């Protein structure tokens, strides 16, 4: 029960309505009031999240025997957010206590930033304001990652269950992962929890790629020879597609052109970039050190990603990852290995930028 609890009747009501835990804020309670309310909660077997906002309150919480410390990043006077507060106050907390970061938890990058010193996160409107809370939770915890080359409803369901947000449907007859429009419709109907991306090497007729509930079209055509021609291709796709469908551009980072330079040039023309090795789907990676910093937060990193190198890929700090052949059964293009998916996303979930100290 997350409320400004100041009276024990609120705890009785919380338990009556099925609460497992309550929030006690030291900013509004004296030590005596906290102890009395904590005793009532403990009598019901409720966990207590003790909220603190500074060093003094953290010391009070420990003195009062709090085991779950909630660090509120929000200044309750001016509502500003200080995300560094968790790191400062977690350093005062013993290792056997649980630290929960509160307020300002808006994306996976924030979760990874705070994960080195926080054991959990308290998130409210960032999730409840979304039309699909399950998908929003996946994006918050794992990031906007994509599993491409889905060939069946089972593969899509495994991708969503593992933590993916996007599912890639390849509409390209030359690809071993090509799907028909009928198969695509079956996949989308069976797993509506993914946002689907149509992937194609075509340079015209983008409207033909439209299927129900499509989130984006990923242009995987070869390099068009110049930045101007690339922009014309992207503009042509936008002209054919509804405003609700994003336009992504795959950029080969190992081609004849400078992939990093091209990605930078196209940054403002696309909704997202996909940085890949060659034509994609080859199971090979490229030199990630050549990715310009300026494009990373609008790019999905692709090319040879698998459970063994996911942590290294996350360290590149792109917006998200694009997995394909590295989470398939060997020699079976399009048949996703649910075990490999789970291992990859387990690494994504637990990845953070620093150890708690």
Locate the predicted segments by residue:
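Glycine-rich phosphate-binding active-site loops on the catalytic face of alpha/beta enzymes
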Residues: 11-32, 70-80, 117-137, 164-177, ...
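Active-site/ligand-binding-proximal alpha/beta "capping" segment
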Residues: 63-144, 272-275, 279, 283-301, ...
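C-terminal helical cap(s) of enzyme catalytic domains, especially alpha/beta-barrels
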Residues: 83-93, 115, 127-146, 181-191, ...
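Internal catalytic-core helix/loop-beta-alpha segment
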Residues: 248-289
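Catalytic cores of alpha/beta
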Residues: 6-17, 54-64, 104-123, 151-162, ...
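N-terminal active-site wall of soluble small-molecule enzyme domains
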Residues: 1-49, 57-60, 86-89, 168-240
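Active-site beta-loop-alpha junctions enriched in small/polar residues
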Residues: 4-5, 27, 53-55, 74-76, ...
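Hydrophobic faces of well-ordered beta-strands that scaffold small-molecule active sites
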Residues: 1-2, 22-24, 48-50, 69-71, ...
């Amino acid at each position: 029960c997350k409320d400004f609890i100041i009276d024990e009747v609120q705890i009785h009501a919380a338990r009556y309505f099925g609460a497992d835990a309550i929030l006690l804020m030291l900013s509004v309670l004296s030590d005596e009031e906290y102890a009395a309310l904590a005793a009532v909660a403990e009598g019901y077997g409720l966990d207590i999240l003790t909220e603190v906002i500074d060093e003094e309150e953290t010391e009070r919480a420990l003195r009062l025997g709090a085991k779950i410390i909630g660090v509120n990043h929000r200044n309750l006077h001016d509502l500003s957010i200080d995300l560094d507060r968790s790191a400062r106050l977690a350093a005062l907390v013993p290792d056997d206590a649980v630290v929960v970061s509160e307020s300002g938890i808006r994306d996976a990058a924030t979760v990874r930033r705070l994960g080195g010193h926080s054991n959990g996160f308290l998130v409210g409107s960032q999730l409840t304001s979304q039309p699909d809370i399950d998908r929003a939770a996946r994006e918050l915890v794992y990031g906007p990652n994509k599993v491409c080359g889905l060939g069946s409803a089972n593969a899509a369901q495994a991708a969503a269950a593992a933590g993916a947000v996007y599912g890639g449907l390849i509409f390209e007859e030359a690809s071993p992962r090509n799907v028909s429009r009928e198969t695509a419709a079956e996949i989308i109907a069976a797993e509506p929890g993914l946002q689907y991306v149509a992937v194609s090497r075509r340079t015209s007729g983008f409207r033909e790629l439209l299927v129900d509930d499509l989130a984006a079209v990923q242009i995987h055509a070869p390099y068009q020879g110049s930045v101007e021609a690339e922009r014309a291709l992207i503009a042509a796709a936008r002209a054919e597609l509804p405003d609700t469908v994003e336009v992504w551009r795959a950029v080969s980072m190992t081609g004849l052109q400078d992939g990093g330079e091209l990605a930078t040039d196209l940054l403002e023309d696309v909704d997202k970039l996909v940085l890949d090795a060659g034509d994609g789907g080859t199971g090979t990676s490229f030199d990630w050190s050549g990715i310009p910093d300026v494009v990373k937060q609008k790019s999905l990193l692709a090319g040879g990603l698998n459970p063994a190198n996911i942590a290294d890929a996350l360290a590149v700090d792109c917006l998200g990852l694009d997995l394909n052949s590295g989470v398939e059964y060997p020699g079976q293009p399009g048949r996703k290995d649910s075990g490999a998916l789970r291992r990859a996303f387990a690494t994504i979930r637990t990845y953070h930028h620093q150890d708690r100290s």
